[in-house]
Amino acid sequence: TTTRYTETQIRSMINNNMTILRYFRLKDNFGDNGLISSLIIKRQAKILFIDTWVMSCRVLSRGMEEFIFSEIITMAKCLKSTMVRGKYLPSKKNKLVSSLYERLGFKLIKKEPDGASYWELNMKEPLPKISHTIKRTKSKDLDLENWR
C-alpha cells in the first residue's frame, strides 16, 4: 500500500488497541523465505481498514496473498466487523499488485486523481471463494479468539 511509518510511529501502534499489527513468514519447497509480509490494520467501529499491506515481490503468486486475505477475513469475523476496507497507493514498485483488491473480491469505492484507490468488502454479502494451499503453523503470538 506504500504507506511508510517511522519506528516511533510503529511503536505507538503496538500499544494502540485499535491497531492490529501482523507479520507473515513463508517456508515452502523453495526454502525459508523468512519475513515476507506485514499488515497494519486499523479498527474503526465495525470496519477493519487495511492501512498497510507490504509483501516481498519474491513470493508473489505463490498463494500467500490469498492466505493473508483469508487471515484478514478470519480477523473480521472474530471482531464482528461488517466491512473490510483497503487502499492502494501506486508506486514504481507495486504495479504488480495494482489489481489485488479487485482480484480478492473488493469493490472500488473511490479513485483519486493521483491514482490512489479505496476498496471495500462487505462482510454481510457472500464472500468470494478464494483458495490457497498455504498452511498455518502454530504461532505463540497469534490468538484468533482474542484479537485486540
Enumerate the predicted regions with their spans.
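Conserved acetyl-CoA-binding loop-helix of GNAT-fold acetyltransferases
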Residues: 60-74
